[in-house]
């Protein structure tokens, strides 16, 4: 079985560094980009198993990226975990309305993030 791949879309370097460490430690291959347009370019190049997608990004929002993934016949099966510092029920509902598979509010515990990623990738492999 090949290693699962994660595309991390996060524009804040300090958060991206922490997430890169956590995701890598969990045993997943990782690619990080820092903007909405870079996310679309990365998705055109390769199909990850999971996209960890910040809501607030330069150029295009995470909501827009998620909707574009879901509308694309080739990409729509990719799992999407949206993350935001904006928090609150309204943001979570917007993320789920954009067809995200899961939504987490920063700050979150490392164990919670790892558990969520593991669960999404277990579903993907089922």
What are these regions (language model features)?
Residues 32-50:
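Acidic, metal-coordinating helix/loop segments flanking the phosphotransfer/catalytic sites
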Residues 58, 76, 88:
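The feature encodes the CheY-like receiver
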Residues 13-31, 120:
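Two-component/phosphorelay signaling modules centered on CheY-like receiver
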Residues 108-118:
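C-terminal output helix
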Residues 10:
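Conserved acidic carboxylate
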Residues 20, 64, 87-102, 115:
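Alpha4 helix (beta4-alpha4-beta5 surface) of REC/receiver domains from two-component response regulators
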Residues 35-38, 61-67:
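Acidic catalytic/metal-coordinating carboxylates
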């Amino acid at each position: 079985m090949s290693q699962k791949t994660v595309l991390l879309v996060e524009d804040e370097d300090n958060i991206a560094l922490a997430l890169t460490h956590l995701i890598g430690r969990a045993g997943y291959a990782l690619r990080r980009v820092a903007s909405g347009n870079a996310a679309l370019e990365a998705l055109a190049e390769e199909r990850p198993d999971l996209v960890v997608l910040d809501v607030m990004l330069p150029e295009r929002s995470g909501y827009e990226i998620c909707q574009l993934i879901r509308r694309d016949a080739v990409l729509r099966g990719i799992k999407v975990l949206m993350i935001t510092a904006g928090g609150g029920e309204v943001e979570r509902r917007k993320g789920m309305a954009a067809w995200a598979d899961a939504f987490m509010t920063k700050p979150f515990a490392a164990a919670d993030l790892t558990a969520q990623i593991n669960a999404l990738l277990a579903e993907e492999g089922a």
